[in-house]
A protein has these predicted regions:
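Catalytic cores of large soluble enzymes that bind and process phosphate-bearing ligands
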Residues: 55-62, 85, 128, 132, ...
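Glycine-rich tight-turn/loop motif centered on a GG-T
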Residues: 47-59, 124-127, 145-155, 229-241
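Active-site loop/helix belt of alpha/beta enzymes
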Residues: 12, 173, 179, 185-306
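Conserved active-site and cofactor/substrate-binding residues in soluble primary-metabolism enzymes
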Residues: 58-65, 88, 92, 162, ...
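Active-site anion/phosphate-binding pocket segments in diverse small-molecule metabolic enzymes
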Residues: 241-427
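Active-site-proximal beta-alpha core segment in soluble small-molecule metabolic enzymes
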Residues: 83-228
Length: 427
């Protein structure tokens, strides 16, 4: 626990100020409530069979629904689906989704995970999702073992001529051939090629070194299209049209200037969870990448993902229930907080805390900005209506998946409110 001095002062002064009549109408309403039937069943299951520590739950019924939503979109266009491994960082989870979706295409972002993927999924096709330092690529080759053939099954993402030169030198030193996918800046402005002259330099270098470099395609990542950009900057449709103009320009340039590099089997990757549905409206790309949309954390509550359902939750037990909020040094004066705010009339200390997550169930729970956050035993406040007791579970919904899923050890897969499997995460 770390008392936030600024919030402490503002909080105590604020309560005092609000006691006067001019602020009475601002008094918070009671936001508390009991578990829904869904979370009541999960609470009972975890109290009976769970480990009584913070866990990350994957709801397989909801995950199935999300996979099917994605696949209906993909099948309408005849494209392929590539799973974003960093957003689904568990071999069991990836395998489950891959089997239901019928795909062995992965996108990897981290050298240790890449080596793991190559060993565990020897039939997979892997595209790097970001350009790795050449030393990371070298470490991949040094530690790689198994039947996975990088020369045929791995695409290195390259963003500029300088990095391509480094990879060429590595390929020459290893006496191997590398498949090169070129990152395009289609409007995200996070690096990648945005100039045809630069693209020409890279394609020329690939064409001049066929023993060590092979052109594998393009990647144009466009999540901003579906992220709710203010309308004054362009509608999703307008932003999407601009993305595809840039992508098409790079494709046309390559076909015209380097026809020997072009063939039908190239990987023309695009999209991302917020924007994959938009690509039903184009036939240029060959595949879309999706990861986070399979689990739909809070930051992906977007109009473009309205058909998706939240499928991942943190569950953690209540360790202590101590009544009305009580702030160190304020002691009895803390009663002002609970008098003013019904949502501070119960205090719970949970196992762990301070995650990238938002309270989900029971409704009306909140962290305490005056007391401060804690990763050990976080104070959580609620009204009398929440009905929590010691060892009941507090449920939170992650704001994102790629970092959060790695923090809890094995994921617990649930179906129909029952624990049915556990899946280790990447390490």
């Amino acid at each position: 626990m770390a008392v936030n001095r600024r919030n402490f002062v503002l909080g105590t002064l604020g309560v005092g100020a609000l006691l006067v009549g001019v602020g009475a109408w601002l008094r918070p309403g009671d936001r508390g409530g009991l578990y829904s039937e869904y979370f009541r069943a999960l609470n009972n299951e975890l109290k009976a069979k769970g480990p009584m520590r913070p866990v990350l739950l994957i709801d397989l019924d909801r995950l199935d629904h999300n996979i099917d939503v994605v696949m209906r979109s993909v099948k309408r266009t005849g494209k392929h689906l590539r799973l974003v491994e960093k957003s689904l960082p568990s071999p069991g989870l990836l395998s489950y989704i891959g089997q239901r979706a019928g795909t062995q295409r992965l996108m990897s972002f981290h050298q240790p995970f890449l080596n793991h993927d190559a060993q565990v999924y020897p039939q997979s096709d892997i595209l790097l999702g970001k350009p790795l330092p050449v030393r990371s690529a070298e470490l991949f080759y040094q530690t790689h073992k198994g039947p996975f053939d990088p020369a045929k099954q791995l695409q290195w993402l390259i963003d500029n001529p300088e990095r391509l030169q480094q990879y060429l030198a590595l390929a020459q030193g290893l006496s191997t051939r590398m498949r090169i996918n070129i990152e395009l800046d289609v409007g995200l402005h996070r690096g990648g090629v945005s100039d045809l002259n630069v693209l020409g330099q890279m394609l020329a270098l690939i064409a001049a070194n066929p023993q060590h470099l092979e052109f594998a395609g393009f990647m144009g990542y466009d999540p901003f299209v579906g992220m709710g950009v203010p309308g004054m900057l362009g509608s999703p449709e307008e932003l999407f049209a601009k993305v595809m103009v840039i992508y098409q320009r790079c494709v046309d340039f390559t076909r015209q200037q380097y026809p020997a590099l072009w063939h039908d089997g190239l990987c023309l990757n695009t999209a991302g969870s917020p924007s994959y549905r938009m690509h039903e409206n184009e036939n240029l790309s060959s595949e879309v990448s999706v990861g986070t949309a399979m689990l739909k954390p809070t930051h992906y509550d977007l109009p473009s993902l309205v058909e998706h359902e939240p499928a991942a939750y943190i569950a953690t037990p209540v360790l202590k229930s101590t009544g009305a909020v009580n702030i160190p040094a304020l002691d009895d004066k803390s009663k002002l907080f609970s008098w003013w705010d019904a949502n501070q009339r119960q205090t719970f200390f949970i196992y762990g805390g301070n995650w990238m997550a938002e309270f989900e169930s029971p409704p009306g729970l909140q962290s305490n900005g005056v007391y401060g956050r804690s990763s050990n035993q976080e104070m959580v406040n609620g009204s009398n209506a929440v009905g929590l007791t010691v060892e009941d579970q507090v449920f939170l919904r992650p704001t994102q998946t790629e970092a959060v899923l790695l923090q809890f050890g094995d994921l617990l897969a649930v179906r129909g409110g029952k624990i049915v499997d556990s899946w280790p995460v990447y390490t």
